[in-house]
Amino acid sequence: MDEQNLVTAQENASLAADKVKRVIPNYLLEKEGRLVEWYGRLKGNPRTKLLMLYGFIDEIYKAVSVLTPCKKGCTSCCHIPVSISEVEIEVIERGTGTRRNKNISHPSNYHGRPCPFLLNNACSIYTHRPFVCRRHVVLTKTSHWCNPNLANTAKFPLLKFSEVERVFQAILWEAKAKPMDIRQAFGN
């Protein structure tokens, strides 16, 4: 199980990827298959729709949590770029009372810099975290390759649900949202 060995880590991730559909309850897989249709029937503003999508994502990823090292206290992904949109900024502001910076900073290379919401090795806005944080789940047995110094040095299968992605993109389009890094909106 020594996942410092790249081949071992990739094999473990591939095995876990093969198990994903077996650990997710059928009703969730069926709902994911009809998610775009579900989105078409939703009423409300983009923020309301995003919150509903977050609820679904949380259900699906809860089922997959047995296959991933992603747990509270692992902060590797909190040190890579975190893309957010205006509608996600609104979710964070309304959910936490934290206000965005008055002046949005210029884009920068945020790789290796901690997320402004990382406090005591935990996400302080976990319930209101952005989409990218919800869906960024690795399938290796350990978080060794998640370290920002190793991230992007090797390829691993990542969890991805096509209908979830389509609905998220539709919400962004509806909100006319432009992406930025979370550190631009909320960093010092």
Question: Where do the PLM segments sit?
Answer:
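Short loop/turn segments that flank or connect secondary-structure elements
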Residues: 1-76, 80-188
